[in-house]
């Protein structure tokens, strides 16, 4: 690119809400484009057709210190939308994942998660390796989204998905496992069952205005200078391009 004035266009479609985008010149912040605050208070009509993205993660489960033979878990599930299933981003970390039978409003999946035998100390790697998806769906605020995971079936409206995140634990299975391995022990606390249960985390959905950013401005580019963009999402993820 020749030095001088140029028109810079930024177009980002992220997997979650964008916090800000930074334009750096020679590794020094030149301009900050703040996206947070531009969409949170927008009103959505009851009959409005909207697009949202939300992340579903699978993992956690029995601690290897207590259950040494419970290192692998296979999951079977599906997602059905009363509307449209627009896109699916795979957030996979290990082998053994499968997405299939994808249609305009549904999909099926087979996932495999692994528990590491590392200590999990705060200075070391985590014992948990999660797998998941980012789903983009379209519908009205009251459109139903059905997530099936193993023997469980969860129903949410898009409106409910946008309110908060949720963790769904396979709690009874954790109790049954403890009884099978250690025998039935009555105790006033249930921490052990909760912490050793397999869990599905459904992160809070965000509307399209949150994860899409378009920006344009004229910049004066200097010869020999390095320019790059750094995108930061509200969930802490960072990406960059130069």
PLM feature segments, named:
Residues 1-242:
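C-terminal functional module detector
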């Amino acid at each position: 690119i020749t030095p001088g004035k140029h028109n810079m266009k930024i177009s980002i479609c992220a997997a979650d809400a964008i916090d800000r985008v930074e334009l750096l010149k020679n590794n020094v912040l030149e301009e900050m484009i703040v996206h947070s605050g531009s969409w949170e208070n927008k009103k959505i009509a009851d009959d409005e057709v909207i697009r949202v993205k939300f992340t579903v993660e699978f993992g956690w489960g029995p601690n290897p210190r207590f259950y040494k033979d419970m290192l692998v878990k296979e999951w079977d599930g599906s997602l059905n939308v009363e509307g449209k299933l627009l896109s699916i981003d795979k957030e996979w970390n290990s082998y053994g994942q499968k997405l299939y039978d994808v249609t305009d409003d549904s999909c099926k999946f087979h996932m495999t998660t692994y528990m590491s035998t590392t200590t999990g100390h705060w200075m070391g790697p985590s014992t948990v390796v999660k797998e998941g998806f980012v789903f983009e769906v379209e519908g009205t605020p009251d459109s139903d989204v059905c997530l099936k995971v193993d023997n469980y079936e969860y129903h949410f409206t898009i409106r409910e998905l946008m309110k908060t995140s949720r963790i769904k634990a396979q709690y009874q299975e954790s109790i049954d496992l403890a009884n099978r391995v250690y025998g039935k022990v009555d105790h006033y606390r249930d921490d052990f069952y909760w912490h050793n249960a397999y869990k599905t985390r459904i992160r809070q959905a965000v509307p399209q205005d949150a994860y899409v950013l378009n920006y344009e401005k004229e910049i004066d580019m200097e010869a020999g200078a390095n320019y790059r963009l750094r995108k930061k999402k509200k969930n802490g993820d960072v990406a960059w391009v130069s």
